[in-house]
Amino acid sequence: MPDHAISTDPAVQAQLDRLWALSPGADVLGLERITRLLNRLGNPQDALPPVFHVAGTNGKGSTSAMIAAGLREAGHRVGLFTSPHLIEPTERIVVDGRAVSTEEFAEAFAAVHKAAERLIETGALDAHPTYFETVTLMAFWWFAKAEVDWAVIEVGLGGRLDATNIVAPQLCVITPVDYDHEAWLGKSLDSIAFEKAGILKTGVPAVLAPQHPVAREVIARSEERRVGKECR
């Protein structure tokens, strides 16, 4: 059994090995591939309950966790998707404060992997999804299966082209924006803020943390273009 094995069940470990083979660092921004895979999976994201979508640079993971904790305290069954993980990748997919088990994680991966293999066979997909795309798909699939009451989804990278930006949120949250992932999001604060603002949706309320004036102006302009009125 490989050094990174975390299951004594060979069938479960075989699924996990396939996931480990995907490079966590191979980020590819864009929604076309995940859209095709979601269609193949029956669009589990459409079965999700009300969604909080959280972007930003600083504090988005802790903000997501606090939102989920508050909803649980109010008596709701909550799905929480965050990244990266601290110890085990199962930590990324949480239902009611408990990370999914290794077996549940492998079950979700098997469903996503099967969908990807089928699309590749038919020529509808030219490559397997990235590690992050895969785990995002797994979270959507598992939350739909678990019938959660609320889902809290943390953006992985940026926002506008992030794999999570396929959900229809009931509330968008942008935590403080700062310089991060400059190779993908741009080297200026305004370009980074523009990408983060990409999670905002017409008619969906948004909560903005205190921002650097440059980031706040970019986000406000983005929302003004969306709603057709001044946002200050």
Residues of each region from the PLM?
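ATP-dependent carboxylate-amine ligase catalytic core
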Residues: 7, 11, 25, 31, ...
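Pre-Walker A (Motif I) flank of P-loop NTPase domains
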Residues: 47-50, 204
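Hydrophobic anchor at the beta1->P-loop junction of P-loop NTPases
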Residues: 52-54
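Hydrophobic positions on the alpha1 helix immediately C-terminal to the Walker A/P-loop
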Residues: 63-66
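Acidic, Mg2+-coordinating active-site environments of NTP-dependent enzymes
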Residues: 119-123, 147-149, 154, 169-232
